[in-house]
Amino acid sequence: MNDKIKTESVDNLFEAILSLKNTEECYMFFEDICTINELLAIAQRLEVAKLLKEQTTYIEISEETGASTATISRVNRSLKYGNDGYEMVFSRMNKQD
């Protein structure tokens, strides 16, 4: 975990997110706390990660999501060398299906 982001403010943000009970509450909270572009960028990264795990090419991902190759590369680096956060979320999402 990155010590630079481990602050009381970030802890409070995560506690707020964990208090949300459903998708509608997520929309309400995230529309208030994020700009539309910030929220769309986060959603785009999650979609890029999903496509990378499915072995989709950078070109196909860029065409499908509109993500730049720099964004795709950054997400790919997180998938390979990150904290396994994407993997944890995808695993839990698959169990819910």
Question: What is the role of each PLM region?
Answer:
Residues L20-E24, I36, Q55:
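Residues at alpha-helix boundaries and the short loops/turns that link adjacent helices
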Residues M1-L20:
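General nucleic-acid-binding
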Residues N83-D97:
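Short Lys/Arg-enriched helix C-cap and helix-to-coil transition segments
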Residues I42-T56:
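Short, amphipathic alpha-helical "recognition" segments used to contact nucleic acids or chromatin
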Residues N76-L79:
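DNA major-groove recognition helix of helix-turn-helix
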Residues E25-Q44:
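Short, Lys/Arg-enriched anionic-surface-contact patches
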Residues E60-T65, I72:
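Short alpha-helical "recognition helix" segments of helix-turn-helix
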Residues S9-L13, F29, E47, T71:
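A general alpha-helix detector
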